[in-house]
A protein has these predicted regions:
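Outer-membrane beta-barrel porins/channels
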Residues: 20-33, 96, 103-566
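Bacterial Sec-dependent N-terminal signal peptides
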Residues: 1-23, 562, 566
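Hydrophobic alpha-helical membrane-insertion segments
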Residues: 11-12, 68, 389
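N-terminal targeting signals for Sec/Tat export/insertion, comprising classic cleavable signal peptides
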Residues: 30-48
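Outer-membrane beta-barrel translocator/receptor signature
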Residues: 37, 49-58, 63-135, 239-242
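Active-site-proximal flexible loops/turns
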Residues: 9, 66, 270
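Long, acidic, intrinsically disordered low-complexity segments
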Residues: 43, 47-54, 248
Length: 566
């Protein structure tokens, strides 16, 4: 069949988020505001004030301000106020923090301190739902148009359709698991009501429209697909990233404080989603629905190094300045999925249900993170803090594991190479993020404190970013979903209180976090762009545009910390 070969034929007309693809990995790169109740209550703006175990994971020099050893633990509850009722618990208990600091005097006014801590740096618990109209667009049409534009060619092997080179070491990488399901369960009908097909249906060629006999505006046999008039989507995610920190810090003459933290990370992510489209046939009559049910996990480990300093520029002033830097977190990850197409179509439409699964090992590296902070105290009654932090997520990196080699001495080294196509997508989708934190603590009595804080986190996603299913990438090949959301800025408001009695302390904090975004079930496609603007070849029937739906993520957290100084 004579085809137009198009390297990149999809244009996103709207904005859009959500395992090895850019949007999924972006969840691993960011961190929540979490830790001790004192730290959370002040909005985390303690990177210059220090003397809190949670600063071990932000500005390690904060541990250098301890004068007595301390142990503490934090637990609480999280709830999502805007979650739909889909049979999952909206409120969950959480163990958020545990830490220990040991102080050692090294001189008259100097200390060397050691600390260890655990913090749940990322909580993935979320329920996301969306419903919208499609006005003729559909997910299966996207799969068909990728085939039509030679992003993958089909052939039948062992009784099922696969990409033409899908059984050797050179598969058509844009051919993902969703394309496989639609090719085998829906688009290869022998007696079909597909748009673009005649009564003979698919005849086993490289393209899903091979038996149509109808030419399109480009002079090719028409692509075959079902249109849809609407969709329903839900996804429940769960899991966490646990951060384990090991710190050494100290101070010199109570004026300069330094710290170094080595961090280990434990990733546990899972989601279950269902995406349902209501389909119509070539006569635009309803024929039922199809559902893509997807279950995916991401697990693995990572590590980073953090360094920081705090100094008092004026000897007789309590004013402090804090500076810190975090290396990338180097993750070694594994993702697994099982995905099923469930057909509830009328008789004679489609070929029933179909399932697929996959596993993929890869590496993901987050960007460098830089921060600066100011702190000021008024006697023993008032503490004020402000922090600015920056990380450019477009510099995140994804790498494909390629096995390993043994050196002369028998040591094994794993080799990997950059996923260049997905790296380019990261550059287009993600952006630099600024985080601003301010907080205050007031003590009306020596043993009683009240705290308030606020955070602003700028958007991570470019407003024109999209999940590109056409990339020549293993991340695309193993992908099992097409949806994505472009989340906007995050706002957090915090409050808390603390009480000390002799060597014991108890602190309570509340946090409200709100983020809005725009959800898209799949990327949009323009046939006019595919034919380079040639109106004579343009076929409006091939356009596959979907509008975004506004979504939100509103979380409430209550956290309690018990501490003991000795």
């Amino acid at each position: 069949m004579k085809k137009i070969i198009i390297a990149f034929s999809f244009t996103m007309l709207g904005v859009a988020a959500m395992g090895q693809e850019t949007y999924d990995n972006a969840q691993l790169a960011s961190k929540d505001l979490n830790g001790t109740a004192r730290y959370v209550g002040m909005g985390g703006a303690m990177e210059a004030l220090g003397a809190d175990i949670s600063t071990m994971s932000s500005n390690p020099a904060g541990i250098g301000l301890f004068r007595r050893s301390m142990v503490s633990g934090s637990f609480g509850f999280n709830t999502q106020s805007d979650a739909a009722d889909i049979g999952k618990r909206k409120t969950k208990a959480s163990f958020d923090h545990a830490g220990f600091v040991h102080t050692m005097r090294s001189g008259r006014n100097s200390y060397v301190n050691f600390g260890v801590s655990y913090t749940k740096s990322r909580n993935f618990n979320q329920i996301l739902t969306a419903t919208g109209r499609l006005n003729g667009a559909s997910q299966n049409k996207l799969s068909s148009m990728k085939n039509y534009n030679d992003l993958y060619r089909l052939e039948k092997r062992n009784g099922e359709l696969t990409s033409q080179w899908g059984t050797n070491n050179n598969p058509d990488l844009p051919y993902n698991q969703v394309d496989y399901l639609y090719s085998n369960a829906l688009l290869n009908d022998q007696k079909s009501q597909l748009v673009g097909m005649n009564a003979n249906g698919y005849n086993g060629g490289n393209y899903l429209g091979d038996a149509s006999g109808v030419l399109d505006a480009s002079g090719n046999l028409r692509a075959a697909y079902y249109n849809a008039d609407g969709y329903d989507f839900f996804r429940g995610t769960s899991g966490y990233i646990g951060e384990y920190n090991f710190n050494i810090s100290g101070n010199s003459r109570n004026r300069f404080y330094w710290g170094l933290t080595f961090g280990l990370y434990d990733v546990n992510y899972s989601h279950a989603s269902e995406y349902t489209e209501r389909l119509v046939n070539n006569a635009q009559n309803p024929i039922g629905s199809v559902t893509i049910a997807d279950e995916r996990t991401i697990s693995g480990t990572g590590f980073d190094v953090k360094a920081g300093a705090i100094f008092r520029p004026i000897e007789d002033s309590p004013f402090r300045v804090g500076l810190y830097v975090h290396t990338p977190t180097w993750y070694d990850l594994k993702t697994e999925n099982r995905t099923t197409l469930v057909s509830k179509l009328a008789d004679g439409c489609g070929n029933g249900n179909k399932s697929t699964s996959g596993r993929y090992d890869y590496k993901f590296y987050t960007p460098w993170r830089f921060g600066g902070s100011l702190g000021y105290t008024v006697g023993k009654h008032l503490a004020l803090g402000a922090t600015y932090e920056y990380a450019d997520y477009s510099y995140s990196d994804i790498r494909v594991n390629e096995g390993g080699v043994y050196d002369y001495w028998g040591n094994y080294y794993e080799e990997s190479s950059r996923d260049q196509a997905m790296k380019g997508n990261i550059k287009n989708v993600l952006r630099g993020v600024s985080t601003v934190k301010v907080g205050a603590e007031y003590k009306p009595m020596p043993n009683l404190a009240v705290r308030f804080g606020y955070n602003y986190v700028s958007p991570m996603y470019n407003k024109n970013g999209y999940k590109d299913g056409t990339l020549n990438s293993y991340s695309t090949y193993y992908s099992s979903s097409t949806d994505y959301t472009n989340w906007n800025a995050t706002n957090r408001v915090t409050a808390g209180a603390g009480y000390t009695y002799k060597k014991f302390s108890i602190d309570l904090a509340y946090q409200y976090s709100r983020t809005t975004g725009e959800f898209f079930p799949f990327m949009s496609y323009s046939d006019l762009d595919a034919v380079n603007g040639d109106q004579n070849k343009y076929d409006s029937g091939y356009d596959n545009f979907c509008d975004g739906q506004k979504v939100s993520n509103k979380h409430h957290q209550l956290i309690l910390t018990l501490g003991y100084r000795f």
